[in-house]
């Protein structure tokens, strides 16, 4: 059939039918219904039979076109996940080109996913256009249809299979468009694209969920009620056939394809996800299971998994009503028992408010007949009491979902398992469980105490547990608290023995009525002997307000030493059980206390523990506080304080009286271990009262409270001195000289003698302090060789002396100075000397009034003009003054070596004079003048001996200037030298040397001057070392004439040595 015939023109050859078979030549075929036509008659032979097939051919064509349009609409709906109306025509749907454009995008994405490498080399690209112009554009549908045609080309369709955009937009040839879409489907399947088959595609029947659930429920009900597993019953087969008739549709040959998955799922014997029970389908599931009982339940009880009798599953499950609950709650609760030998309760046997009556009647009607042997497995025998009395009512307010998972409510020991996971009891099933256990008591409860899990006598567990009332508690609290004792040899408390405010009286009466008969040997194991007193008196009520969950875990309340176990975890003391523990320890003292001190755990005598511990009152504290504070001393040879010996404001008096009444008899040897000897003084005097307000948790961690040095502990952390305790520490050292601990001071450290630690520390009151304060402060002196006197002692001695220095020593000493060329020496002389003030008898007087006269410039050598070196000599007016010693500067200079401006050690801080050297900076002002003429050159060498005056360029010279400025002068000067100084100050700054080579050549001439400067420093250090009084030195009259003569001699000497 030609294209012209398909478009409605006259057929040139109608011998090809719609199904592709060629018609016989002798049969006359008429044109199709689209008219047109002509008729071609074949050559007729004799006896030929003419058959007219015009009616059958037209009928087939009509059916063919209707099928194509129907399948096209279904195929487009399946690809695009759309649903079209029954009356919608394909021509109208495709006219705007939007559907074809959407199909092109879907196919393009599939092609990119499967054939990305091949499409990269293709020149045809399909992209989604953001806008096609105006929504009512005339040519917008043509552009969309063109995108679909490009996809057809990529898939490999030939030109004869394609259509033109006008066939769709103008609805000229809708049949050819449908045939093209069919070809696209076939090509896509060949390329393994996930598209439906055009020929077999059908509508996807949508059914409500309740209809599907009802069908499957009926199928499962029939199989559930069948006694054999041979397969479907005739009734079930009839129902399946009925469903196939209803939902089969016209294509019966595809029924197996549509319902394969349903039949496979219907063969499952278990419950599907849609069979979950909720409030809506509760009645339906209940009736379903009531009608289909499990007839094989008789053997179900023999497997040891609990016998439910003829009760249905609905009664054992009921309606699960979950309001606001965390998803992890059901996952974390250990409701399912996973032991192989015994599974009393299955997961569906959980008890709640709804199935309370059902479970009650179940257990009353069908008790476990093997309960007599239950006790033989070692799973706890509570006597004739019921489980409800041994558990009580668990009242939980706001609790994290991980609480039940983390709480160690289940005892996992093999020999003794009092409670199974399925035995959880709450307020709702209290009566049911009570009646259950009352009807089936355990008769072998007498042997329960022999298993070593604690013997409660005939008392029930509820008296030892009571009601657990938890307010707002972190989920990790129960997990982290060490409530369970896991030692093999001794397990005094089981998890159910926790004591609180509610069951205090019950536990008290329980332990009073049934004391542990083996308590006499309990003390021998080294775990503290409580005598005949009950556990309630030693534990009391644990009252926790708002506390972090890690507090109980991190606090080192348990002593882990092998030789000494003074307190077990249950021995914690607080404000509530203060009186109980006091009476307990007073009435039943530890008889082995004499040997207790010998183990190195501290000897408290006959005093009770409460006096050494007191009441621990914690308000709002960080959880890491107890963990980070190193309160436990871990040395083997000396353990002065145990964890229970912590002292605060509350137990201050108790600890004071305890240690005063019961001193440590081994204190004489205690000092010999190298841990500090405090004599016979009490602990309170050596510690004092520690008052901490709001403090960071890292404070105790960062502060070095534990001294770990073996041989030498000069200053403990408590000896740190700051502005607050300066007076106290000063008086301590002044009032407490070392009298009897001679060997202690010989190591080069301070000696505290018989003074207590409290006198050297005092009361440490900390308000709001940063945790890094104690860590960053460096209060400990770590030098071994330096142990000088105090600042007052150093400044209380005065040494007037005269020293001479030979020229050889001056030359050797001056060789350390380094010159730098090209520097203007006038800059040093420009420093103002009018601001200098002399200190005399505590009063400051300006020295400016003593400076008079004019200056004079020394004549330079003729050959030094090219170098530009100018040496100026200044004269100072006659004056006399004394310099008072500053205690702080002298003390600081004793401990710290001299440093340059950049932190480099100065050349003058050698061993010969490194101890006491003042480092007071005067900014280049007039310095001290000694009695020796050589020392007086310091004022002139400011402009002559150093050619690098800028402290940024020459830190060494700057250091020397700083040290020179620390000495003031009181000596008169000669009048003839005043003119020289004034002339030097009046010299312009622009007159600078032109070269630095002359400076290097005149070094020899300045060696004498340099030696004089260094000798002056050396002599100053010697004077400071031998001073005895409060004044550093006395001023003496110095003549500067000798200085000028020495300078001239040095110049002449340099001229002789020059080539």
Swiss-Prot record:
Gene Ontology biological process terms in this record: actin crosslink formation
Signal peptide interval: none
Region (7 X approximate repeats): 269-786
Polar residues bias locations: 907-924, 945-958
Listed Basic and acidic residues bias regions: 515-534, 858-869, 984-994
Keyword set, alphabetical order: Endoplasmic reticulum, Membrane, Repeat, Transmembrane, Transmembrane helix
UniProt Sequence repeat ranges: 269-342, 343-416, 417-490, 491-564, 565-638, 639-712, 713-786
Name of the coding gene: O10
Superkingdom per UniProt: Eukaryota
Disordered: region residues: 511-534, 732-756, 856-875, 889-998
Summary of subunit composition and partner proteins: Homodimer. Interacts (via N-terminus) with FL1 (via C-terminus), HIP, 19 kDa alpha-zein (AC P06677), 22 kDa alpha-zein (AC O48966), 16 kDa gamma-zein (AC P08031) and 50 kDa gamma-zein (AC C0P381).
Membrane topology field: Single-pass membrane protein
Subcellular location: Endoplasmic reticulum membrane
Entry's free-text remark on domains: The seven repeat domain is responsible for dimerization.
Name of the protein: Protein OPAQUE10
PANTHER family (UniProt xref): GAS2-LIKE PROTEIN PICKLED EGGS (PTHR46756:SF18), TRANSGELIN (PTHR46756)
Organism: Zea mays (Maize)
